[in-house]
Amino acid sequence: MIWFNKRIQIVPCEVSPRVCFSAAANFVGSGVLGGIGVVTLTKVKHRRELLFASLPTLFAIHQFTEGFVWLGLDGYLKPAATHYWGEAFMLFAQGLLPFLMPLSVQLFEPNTPSRRRMVPFTILGGITTLYMLWALMSFPTSIYVQGNSIVYINPGTQITALAAIYIICTCGSLFFSKEPPMVLFGGANLLALLFVMAVKRYAFTSLWCAYAAFASVIILAYFWQSRALRPFLYTKHA
């Protein structure tokens, strides 16, 4: 067990081809998502669409960072490097995503009434993000492999009530969108979340982010199919 600045502890796993395969899977998945992200961004027609359209690219970068976490856990990277990659993964998964998701939906909505419906989710997401960032900086995080998955444990974020708030922040705003594909994306994320909670709750942070990333193909499909209908007028009224 190795300690880093009293904040992250990495538990190296035994040398195993499984870990190399898992790292490769993350890197390949990141490349696929990166391609999806680039194509999605080429379909953007208004600055308000940019953050939501950037989600596949952000997920691609996120999966890329976890590939290095896998390599670090298997001893291919120096402990300090593994520490930084683990921090980067947790920063996005638990620190930024609860705020970025509702904000991206709020910006994308075409009129003021729709955007106002998103405000509570964005505010809650902002508060959640502030707490998550504080917890990640204040409590030690353990990172280790269990059941072929990476487990990220932080005492400050491992709270049931906080998990419920996290779900509301990341999925809730999508269900209140006027755009059916966004509701579909929210449903896909929620189903993935429930599946992970039922099957591998201990590896929730890693696996749900992976499933959510690949569900972002729905975002590409939406931008592709709606390119003739956008950009929205972004009016003040419905």
Task: Place the predicted regions along the sequence by residue.
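C-terminal transmembrane-bundle signature of multipass membrane proteins
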Residues: 178-238
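Membrane-proximal helix-loop-helix units in multi-pass membrane proteins
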Residues: 97, 104-169
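Hydrophobic alpha-helical transmembrane segments of multi-pass membrane proteins
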Residues: 55-72, 188, 192-197
